[in-house]
Amino acid sequence: MSSGTELLWPGAALLVLLGVAASLCVRCSRPGAKRSEKIYQQRSLREDQQSFTGSRTYSLVGQAWPGPLADMAPTRKDKLLQFYPSLEDPASSRYQNFSKGSRHGSEEAYIDPIAMEYYNWGRFSKPPEDDDANSYENVLICKQKTTETGAQQEGIGGLCRGDLSLSLALKTGPTSGLCPSASPEEDEESEDYQNSASIHQWRESRKVMGQLQREASPGPVGSPDEEDGEPDYVNGEVAATEA
């Protein structure tokens, strides 16, 4: 008996503890349910109030407009004519600057919303056709003339001479004030360009330099330099060693 009583006491204690825990859980769960019920009730009340105010405003908006309805007929007709001008006059233009309305001060002229430059863009963008637009201008700065006065010769010679040709001419001897003489082929080639004066200067300076180099170091007899008159390369050192 003693062993049975010892086992009953712990079992009873466990049952008591379980009952206390269950009662506490029940008490704790009841306030949460009450709070949720209260919140739901408050929400339902608010929704009912909003629906009531909405129906009330709708009823206010839906009230009839006071006043006679006979005066509204001409204004409606004017509005229809304003938005649909073809109802009264089928021959009228579709686009108008001012609506007809009461027909006071109507404007029937149509203004194109797109500027005329848009249509004429291709015509304005094309340059005027000119056959000689891509050709070179043959500007003749100086020409050799035999019937010129002394003042004209000095002026033309100043244009045709350069600093290099002037210094070389002082070394070799006096030169004429006219433009340097050239062959007809050279004149034709130089007249095709605008810088014909600079071409003449370069050719004359090249001739003078060739003459000075030939005088300083004469080559052997019958050399191609003497035949051409304008050597491309002059080997002065080699000619001096051979002599």
Swiss-Prot record:
Outcome reported for the amino acid change (mutating residue 110 to F): No change in phosphorylation upon BCR activation
Origin superkingdom: Eukaryota
Residues annotated with Phosphotyrosine modification: 58, 136, 193, 233
Listed GO biological process terms: adaptive immune response; B cell activation; B cell receptor signaling pathway; calcium-mediated signaling; intracellular signal transduction; mast cell degranulation
Modified residues (Phosphoserine): 44, 59, 92
Effect in UniProt of substituting residue 118 to F: No change in phosphorylation upon BCR activation
UniProt feature coiled coil, ranges: none
Effect of residue 95 to F: Slightly reduces phosphorylation upon BCR activation
Entry's transmembrane regions: 6-26
GO molecular function: SH2 domain binding
PANTHER family: LINKER FOR ACTIVATION OF T-CELLS FAMILY MEMBER 2
Region annotation Disordered: where it falls in the sequence: 174-243
Membrane topology (Cytoplasmic): 27-243
Short name of one Pfam family: LAT2
Post-translational modifications: Phosphorylated on tyrosines following cross-linking of BCR in B-cells, FCGR1 in myeloid cells, or FCER1 in mast cells; which induces the recruitment of GRB2. May be polyubiquitinated.
GO cellular component, one term: extracellular exosome
Membrane association type: Single-pass type III membrane protein
Extracellular side: 1-5
Main localisation: membrane
Protein name (database record): Linker for activation of T-cells family member 2
Lipidation (S-palmitoyl cysteine): 25, 28
Gene it is expressed from: LAT2
Quaternary state and interactors: When phosphorylated, interacts with GRB2. May also interact with SOS1, GAB1 and CBL.
